[in-house]
Structures are given as structure tokens and as C-alpha cells.
């Protein structure tokens, strides 16, 4: 530590015990000074909010509390000491909740996700009860999808009815799900909540015949021609689907890719499509690829765009269109020669897919970007949904950007989010301790959250993909994540196996996995 001016100093690791104001602060890296009001500031003039001493001690010991529900943690992110893993909140909540309650969410074709749980049902714990049910229902909606909520609790019915009304706290979720499922959103009070009903489909792993696999990304499109399990041709073409408002551009790009692959096969027996977005019965219900297409054209020209492109080009051949996250999970299952795989891609957002114990694709939404992971009152807000504490702000480039200033990394505001991520990655490549703190914090987030995802999915393997997981930062995230699982969740040892993709996974590839989706007739 060396003085630069009065009350100014430079540090590598800073951990203040107590100053004259009776305040405590966390660990940071870089140059600091104390201003006239006794506040700790970065060298660029940015303030750090100092916590009162008693409150800071509580965080150092990992005691988390909200709405009268508390939990003790061994592992706390060094750059986000308020982080309260939602799984630990739920566990502590249920330890004292005794009143039975059921909730269910219905989606397309009569499929239902039902949870039998408990609340306190006392006046003093009503806020905690409402918060728990709010987070549970939101998790069910974004994990499995739905347009109708059922509950057998009159009090929780009134709360959910208010939240999921126009202008209510969950108006975004209500409107989104109503559009995806093409059905008005409803909350129903009943004394007979429907039980869970699923219909996972055996997709993928079909390598016989002449197949085409198409992978539609936001910046490039990939296509493969596969003959009896062997890739005989593949190409990758840059395109700009997110900035084009004319759906003819998308249609022509898809058809061009299909024809390019078909030219290298004697015939076409089946076509599989992997595409970012939400797909129900092969139809596009919501996808950022068509972000600029006017709403009035979406229904007529986008919802069936893949179906039209395939049938217009090849006639009546088997086809399958699913979310790219599910295809990633399928590629992981094929490379591992195992099942029960949750794939998580940490890039622009948090994308996910799941292959169950029987190797089947579930048809769930798996939109983990909007599933709550943090119960802290001050959790970061997602600009799109307006909610706080959801996965997108922890397991995407947004998570890195959020933590960087707390580590003393100053990112130019003019940079795009992808460029800001790259800047932190470059620091990590040079062993910058500030960047390491960012990745360690994400590793702690991930360890706690994977344990929670395990309670939702029962997954055995977790495949970690995307730009955030690339390079040395990804290795550090994985190492810290495994340590958190070992220390906080020893019961999951051997039952939950997070990993980065290996060469075998890369050989399978997204487009080849997509080609394996449909069975031949």
C-alpha cells in the first residue's frame, strides 16, 4: 500500500476491519481514497456503499435473512456478499412451514406441472408465504411453461390473481405466456389441483439415412449433411436475422442452407432444426431471430417458417424443430453416451436445454434466464422483465459486467456488452486479480444454483457452454463451482457432475445433433 495523496492509497487486496466511522468494507482491488464524508471511493470517483459494522459481520459469517427466513452459508461471493441462493431460502422456509398447499401450471395439450408444498399461513409470515409462492410459480412458468395457474389456497389465489393481472407485478410474465400459448392467462382457485402430466418425446440419436441438420444462430447459420451417421458436408454462413424486418430474408436464408446441404446427399430422408427461441409443435412462438419482424406479420409468416421451408423444399419428409438449448443437451448426451443432461449456455443470455433419464426431450421451456436464483432484496433487475434476482443477471455476460466495477475494473460505457466481456476476459488471460475475483464470484453463484437446478431437474450431468465459460475464466468458474458443491452440498457428490465441453462434444456439433432429431418413417 502506498500513499498517493492525503487519504489516498493503492491496494491489491483490501479488507478493512473498522475505520473511525465504525464501518466495514469488503474486498476490492485498485486505487482508492477516503472523501471528506468518510466514504470509500475508486480512483475514478465511484463510491462504494459501506455497510454498518454489525451488518457487515453478519455477511462475513454467511448469515442470510429475508422475511424472517434465515440460512447459514459457508460460501458467499466475494463481490456480492448479499447473495441469498433461492434454493437455500426455500429449504429454510419449508423447515418452519407446516400448512399444506398445492399449485400447478398448465401448458399446451393439457400438460401440467404440479407441486405439493407448504406455507406458514399465519399473519406474521404472510409476506414470506407470498414471496415463496411467487418465486415458485414463476419458476414453474419459465422452466416448464404455462398459461393457467391452479391453487387450492384462497389467500394465495387472491395474491396470484393480483400479481398476474394487467398492470400487476407479473404482467410481463402473464403477457409473454399468453402470447406463447395463444391462450388468455388465467389463475384458478380449486379444491382439486390437477396432478403433473408430462409427455416427453424420444428425439435424437437417429443416425440412419440421409439427413440434414440446420442450426440457426443470431450471427451465423450452420448446416450439415449427414449420411448414415457420418457428416459428409457442413457449412457456416454469416447472416443478420436480428436486424432484418422482412421475413422473406429469413425464409430465403433457411432454404438456401437446406439446398446447399441437399446437394451433397443422394436424397433427403429427414430434416432437424435447432433454433434459438421457443418452439411448440415445430412452430415458432417467440424468438429473437425474428426480433424486427412486425407483429402483424409474425403469425402469418414466422410461426410456420421452418415447416414451410422444409416442405416447400423437400415435400413430405419427417422434420423436427426444437430449441437450441435442448439440442445442446442432446449433443452432450450423445458425446457422453449417457442421459440426464442439463445444458446451460452462458452468453448473451442464459439458455438451457434438458434431456431426461430416458434420453428424451421434455418439451419444457427451460428458459432459465427468467427463473429466480437470488432471494436478496437488492438483487439486480432484469431490464426486459422488470423482475430481480433471475438467472440472466448471474449466468450471462451481464453477470460479468455487473461484477466488474465491484472488483475495481472500469469498463468504457461506449463498449457493447460483448466487448465488455472480452475486456474482462483479456484481463483474466493476464492473471489480473480483479478479473479472477469476478470469475470466482460467478463460480460461487453457479455452485449454489446448480444444486437448486438439481432439485428441479434431477440432472446428473451439467454441460456448461457459452462465451462466459470460455478461456481461463471458465476454468476458474468450474473449479470454484465444484468446491462450493463439495462444501455446501456434500449429498450431491457423484450425483451432480458439472463439466465443460470436450473434443468429443465438439465433434458431434449442434447441426449434426439436430440432424439426428427426427425418426425415419
Regions found by a protein language model. Give the residues of each.
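Short glycine-aspartate micro-motif
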Residues: 148-150, 209-215, 268-272, 341-345, ...
Amino acid at each position: 500500500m502506498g500513499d498517493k495523496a492525503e487519504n489516498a492509497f493503492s491496494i491489491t487486496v483490501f479488507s478493512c476491519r473498522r475505520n473511525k466511522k465504525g464501518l466495514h468494507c469488503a474486498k476490492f482491488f485498485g486505487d482508492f481514497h477516503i472523501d471528506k464524508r468518510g466514504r470509500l471511493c475508486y480512483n475514478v470517483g465511484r463510491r462504494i456503499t459501506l455497510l454498518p459494522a454489525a451488518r457487515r459481520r453478519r455477511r462475513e459469517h454467511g448469515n442470510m435473512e429475508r422475511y424472517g427466513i434465515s440460512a447459514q452459508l459457508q460460501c458467499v461471493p466475494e463481490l456480492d456478499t448479499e447473495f441469498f441462493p433461492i434454493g437455500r431460502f426455500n429449504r429454510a422456509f419449508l423447515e418452519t412451514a407446516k400448512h399444506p398447499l398445492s399449485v400447478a401450471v398448465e401448458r399446451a395439450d393439457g400438460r401440467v406441472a404440479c407441486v405439493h408444498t407448504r406455507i406458514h399461513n399465519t399473519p406474521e409470515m404472510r409476506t414470506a408465504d407470498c414471496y415463496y409462492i411467487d418465486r415458485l410459480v414463476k419458476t414453474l412458468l419459465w422452466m416448464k411453461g404455462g398459461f393457467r395457474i391452479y391453487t387450492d389456497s384462497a389467500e394465495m389465489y387472491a395474491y396470484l390473481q393480483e400479481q398476474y393481472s394487467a398492470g400487476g407485478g407479473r404482467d410481463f410474465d402473464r403477457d409473454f405466456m399468453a402470447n406463447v400459448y395463444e391462450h388468455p392467462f388465467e389463475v384458478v382457485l380449486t379444491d382439486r389441483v390437477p396432478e403433473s402430466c408430462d409427455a416427453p418425446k424420444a428425439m435424437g440419436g437417429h443416425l440412419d439415412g440421409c439427413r440434414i441438420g440446420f442450426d440457426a444462430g443470431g450471427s451465423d447459420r450452420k448446416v450439415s449433411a449427414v449420411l448414415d451417421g457420418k457428416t459428409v458436408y457442413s457449412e457456416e454462413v454469416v447472416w443478420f436475422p436480428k436486424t432484418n424486418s422482412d421475413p422473406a430474408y429469413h425464409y430465403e436464408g433457411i432454404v438456401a442452407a437446406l439446398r446447399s446441404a441437399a446437394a451433397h446427399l443422394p436424397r433427403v430422408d429427414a430434416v432437424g432444426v435447432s433454433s434459438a427461441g421457443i418452439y411448440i409443435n415445430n412452430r415458432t412462438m417467440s424468438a429473437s431471430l425474428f426480433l424486427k419482424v412486425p407483429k402483424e406479420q409474425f403469425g402469418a409468416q414466422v410461426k410456420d417458417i421452418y415447416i414451410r421451408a422444409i416442405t416447400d423444399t423437400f415435400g413430405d419428409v419427417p422434420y423436427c424443430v426444437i430449441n437450441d438449448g435442448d439440442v445442446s443437451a442432446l449433443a452432450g448426451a450423445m458425446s457422453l453416451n449417457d442421459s440426464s443432461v442439463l445444458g446451460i449456455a452462458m452468453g448473451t443470455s442464459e439458455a438451457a436445454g434438458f434431456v431426461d433419464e430416458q434420453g428424451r426431450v421434455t418439451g419444457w421451456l427451460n428458459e432459465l434466464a427468467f427463473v429466480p436464483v437470488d432471494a436478496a432484496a437488492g438483487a439486480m433487475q432484469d431490464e426486459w422483465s422488470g423482475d430481480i434476482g433471475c438467472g440472466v443477471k448471474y449466468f450471462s455476460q451481464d453477470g460479468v459486467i455487473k461484477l466488474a466495477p465491484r472488483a475495481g475494473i472500469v469498463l468504457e460505457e461506449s463498449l457493447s456488452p460483448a466487448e465488455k466481456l472480452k475486456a474482462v476476459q483479456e484481463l483474466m488471460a493476464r492473471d489480473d486479480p480483479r478479473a479472477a475475483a469476478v470469475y470466482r464470484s460467478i463460480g460461487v453463484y453457479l455452485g449454489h444454483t446448480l444444486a437448486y437446478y438439481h432439485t428441479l431437474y434431477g440432472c446428473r450431468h451439467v454441460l456448461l457452454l457459452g462465451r462466459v465459460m470460455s478461456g481461463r475464466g471458465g476454468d476458474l468458474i468450474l473449479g470454484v463451482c465444484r468446491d462450493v458443491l463439495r462444501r455446501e452440498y456434500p449429498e450431491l457428490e457423484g450425483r451432480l457432475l458439472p463439466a465443460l465441453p470436450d473434443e468429443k462434444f465438439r465433434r458431434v456439433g449442434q447441426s449434426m445433433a439436430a440432424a439426428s432429431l427426427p425418426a425415419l418413417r
